[in-house]
């Protein structure tokens, strides 16, 4: 009479686990280690659920974890799997928070240096402090030197073109305007010059 009572205890205990733990609802009534294999399969299917269901399952696993691990060896898989689920949820949260490639583009637009080049520049500065800057400097420097030479050549040609030409008559008045202290002297000098050019022989 003692032998038929023992098999009835294991299914009752398994039924109690099925009612309490939602993650172990798919447990079979096989004896030995077979009844924990479906539990592992159901645990690997947890990431397919929605985040709200994962949070509920994780809360129940946290509440029932210590009591189950003390009695039976099967639920030892729950803490590690729980950590992996939390890690996956963290990844999903970071991806949704940053917004994928668009957030990377906005960050590279607003920030002066991308995240990867800062580390590379730090390594280059440790090896040789001026190498990272001198790589990009010479092309700009050469272009600036070429541009300066062209400007000097054009300005020299522009100034040389006026050397053979006669000086304009208004150049004297321009110098007098700079040196004179008032408009009266400018008007008098201009009036005297015009009278002299008019052919007044007594003045000459």
From Swiss-Prot:
A motif (BH3) lies at residues 147-161. One of its GO terms (biological process) is ATP metabolic process. Changing residue 170 to A: Enhances pro-apoptotic activity. Changing residue 170 to D: No pro-apoptotic activity; even. This is Bcl2-associated agonist of cell death. Residues 85-97 have a biased composition (Polar residues). One of its GO terms (cellular component) is mitochondrion. Residues 1-138, 160-179 are annotated as: Disordered. It is found in: Mitochondrion outer membrane; Cytoplasm. Changing residue 112 to A: Enhances pro-apoptotic activity; no phosphorylation.
């Amino acid at each position: 009479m003692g032998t038929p009572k023992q098999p009835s205890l294991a299914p009752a205990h398994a039924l109690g686990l099925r009612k309490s733990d939602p993650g172990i609802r798919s447990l079979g009534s096989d004896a030995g280690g077979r009844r924990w294999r479906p539990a592992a399969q159901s645990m690997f299917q947890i990431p397919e659920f929605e985040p709200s269901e994962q949070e509920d399952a994780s809360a129940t696993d946290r509440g029932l974890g210590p009591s189950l691990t003390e009695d039976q060896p099967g639920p030892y898989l729950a803490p590690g799997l729980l950590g992996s689920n939390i890690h996956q949820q963290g990844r999903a949260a970071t991806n949704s928070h940053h917004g994928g490639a668009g957030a990377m583009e906005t960050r590279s637009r607003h920030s002066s240096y991308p995240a990867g080049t800062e580390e590379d520049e730090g390594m280059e500065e440790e090896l040789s402090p001026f190498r990272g800057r001198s790589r990009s400097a010479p092309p700009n420097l050469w272009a600036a030197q070429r541009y300066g030479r062209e400007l000097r050549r054009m300005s020299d040609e522009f100034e040389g073109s006026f050397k053979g030409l006669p000086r304009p008559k208004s150049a004297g008045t321009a110098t007098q305007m700079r040196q004179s202290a008032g408009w009266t002297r400018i008007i008098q000098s201009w009036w005297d010059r015009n009278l002299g050019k008019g052919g007044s022989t007594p003045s000459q």
